[in-house]
């Protein structure tokens, strides 16, 4: 499993990231509201579009690897299940 997050824009109110799962398409959008301190998937990527558990997993990785690391410009998360 692989996720790719890339910052699209940042303001004093929110940070917007493009993201994808298992591809480099960056076809989804995740928004983090700085005032409310919460993240949500604004537009799911193709792999998450019809699967609520996939969206929850992608959002968890966004929070753990992007938000907790002070919003890097680009972040790739890779998990190898054996």
Please identify what each model-predicted range represents:
Residues 1-5, 49-52:
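N-terminal start-of-chain detector that recognizes signal peptides
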Residues 31, 36-82:
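Acidic, low-complexity intrinsically disordered segments
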Residues 1-2, 24, 35, 45:
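Extended interaction-bearing regions that mediate binding to partners or small molecules
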Residues 2, 7-28:
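Amphipathic, interaction-prone secondary-structure segments
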């Amino acid at each position: 499993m692989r996720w790719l997050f890339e910052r699209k824009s940042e303001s004093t109110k929110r940070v917007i990231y493009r993201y994808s799962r298992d591809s480099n398409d960056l076809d989804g959008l995740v928004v983090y509201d700085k005032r409310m301190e919460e993240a949500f998937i604004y537009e799911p990527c193709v792999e998450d579009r019809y699967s609520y558990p996939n969206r929850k997993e992608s959002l968890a990785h966004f929070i753990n690897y992007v938000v907790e690391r002070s919003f890097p410009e680009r972040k790739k998360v890779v998990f190898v299940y054996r």
